Amino acid sequence: MSETAERKPILDVVGIQKLLPHRPPFLLVDRVVEFEPNKRVVALKGVTMNEPFFQGHFPAQPVMPGVLILEALAQAAALLATLSMKPEEVNDKITYLMGIDAARFRRPVVPGDRLELEVEVTKQKGAVWKQTGVARVDGQVVAEAEFMAMLADRER
């Protein structure tokens, strides 16, 4: 078990739901364990056999779909941007994913794994953020990608 996995969360799933519009079963981040404003976030996702996607992907040999690993990284990236905002701005903004580049999958993620989602800002100009994300299980890279996202006004 990694040092990060044992640390007390900075933000739990209840707090995450106050910041992200996603809800189960599409909320793919359980907690935030490290955060540096405008720089970096580390979040965790416990992968259990109860995940609805395992019913069809694949019943005899369950594997978390790669696109959902990328979505978990994108949600961690959105948390990084949201947590970096001024508190009075949080309820007025939403993060939209604009693009994914250089996505690579290194090994399957299966029930019982704990995804460690690390996202770092590579560039930020105005409302547009460029970030890199790496997903690990037990310290081994399982997926990585580059993301571009934009903070926009929330529709009321």
Swiss-Prot record:
Enzyme class name: lyase
Any one Gene Ontology BP term: fatty acid biosynthetic process
Residues the record marks as active site: 57
Top-level taxon in the UniProt lineage: Bacteria
Membrane-crossing segments per the record: none
Subcellular location: Cytoplasm
SUPFAM superfamilies: Thioesterase/thiol ester dehydrase-isomerase
Coiled-coil region: none
Enzyme nomenclature, EC number: 4.2.1.59
GO cellular component terms, A-Z: cytoplasm; membrane
Catalytic activity: a (3R)-hydroxyacyl-[ACP] = a (2E)-enoyl-[ACP] + H2O
Gene3D superfamilies documented for this protein: Hotdog Thioesterase
Protein keywords: Cytoplasm, Lipid A biosynthesis, Lipid biosynthesis, Lipid metabolism, Lyase
One annotated GO molecular function: (3R)-hydroxyacyl-[acyl-carrier-protein] dehydratase activity
CDD domains: FabZ
Pfam families with a match to the protein in the record: FabA
Assigned protein family: Belongs to the thioester dehydratase family. FabZ subfamily.
Annotated NCBIfam families: fabZ, PRK00006.1
UniProt function note: Involved in unsaturated fatty acids biosynthesis. Catalyzes the dehydration of short chain beta-hydroxyacyl-ACPs and long chain saturated and unsaturated beta-hydroxyacyl-ACPs.
Protein name: 3-hydroxyacyl-[acyl-carrier-protein] dehydratase FabZ
